[in-house]
Design a protein with these regions (language model features):
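Small-residue helix/turn framework positions
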Residues: 2-164, 170-192
Length: 192
C-alpha cells in the first residue's frame, strides 16, 4: 500500500508492505448492551524496515467507536517524517528511529483510555527552517530528554470522554510533552 498525505507540504508518503491481517465478524446491533467486537490482527512493514503489529478488538459501526487495541512499531526511520516536524516544530529530522507500543480502549460510554510508550533513538533535528509555521527549541528539548546513550523514553497516558465536546487530544498531548520537558529541565537539579 502506498500511503500519501497531500495535506502537508512537502507531501509525505510511506510504503506499507508485507501486510497480513484479519478482521472478525461484527454487527451494528448491540447484544446485551454492548457492541459486538471483532477480533483484529494486522502485521506488516513500514518503509521496508519498521515492523508493524496491531492486535485487539473493535467495532467500527458502534457509536462511539468501540475498540480495545494494542499496536507496536519497531525501528521506524524518522527523517522521512520531516514534513511533520517542520510544520509543528520548525526543524527537519536529520536522523533517528522510533519504536512505540500503544494501547487504546474506548468503552461503550465513550470513555477513552490510552497508553503511549515511545522510544526515540539517536534523534537529531536539523537547523530551523526559514518560513516554517512554528519554531520550537527542539535541539534543547532533545538534549534534555535523551539519556547518555541518546535514547528518549516517553510515556504519554491519555484519558477522557469522547462525549465531552471540550475533549481534544491535541491539548492533552501538548500538556504531557510540556510536563516532560519541565521534568527534564529540573532533573539535573535533583542530583545536587
Amino acid at each position: 500500500i502506498d500511503f500519501a498525505d497531500h495535506f502537508i507540504r512537502p507531501n509525505y508518503s510511506a510504503d506499507l508492505t508485507d501486510l497480513n491481517g484479519s478482521l472478525g465478524a461484527f454487527s451494528s446491533v448491540a447484544q446485551a448492551g454492548a457492541p459486538q467486537m471483532a477480533d483484529l490482527v494486522l502485521t506488516g512493514r513500514a518503509e521496508g524496515s519498521a515492523a508493524l503489529d496491531v492486535r485487539g478488538k473493535l467495532n467500527p459501526l458502534a457509536t462511539p467507536l468501540a475498540l480495545d487495541i494494542q499496536a507496536k512499531v519497531s525501528d521506524l526511520d524518522l527523517p522521512p517524517l520531516s514534513p511533520y516536524s517542520v510544520k509543528y516544530a520548525g526543524h527537519g529530522i536529520e536522523r533517528g528511529k522510533l519504536s512505540m507500543d500503544v494501547g487504546y480502549k474506548i468503552l461503550p460510554d465513550g470513555q477513552l483510555t490510552a497508553s503511549n510508550k515511545l522510544v526515540l533513538n539517536q534523534l537529531e533535528f536539523g537547523d530551523a527552517v526559514p518560513g516554517a509555521p512554528a519554531s520550537l527549541p527542539v535541539q534543547l528539548a532533545t538534549a534534555l530528554l535523551a539519556d547518555s546513550d541518546g535514547v528518549i523514553d516517553l510515556d504519554l497516558p491519555i484519558s477522557g470522554s469522547l462525549n465531552d465536546p471540550q475533549f481534544s487530544l491535541g491539548p492533552i498531548i501538548f500538556k504531557a510533552i510540556i510536563n516532560l520537558i519541565g521534568k527534564a529541565i529540573t532533573a539535573p537539579f535533583t542530583l545536587l
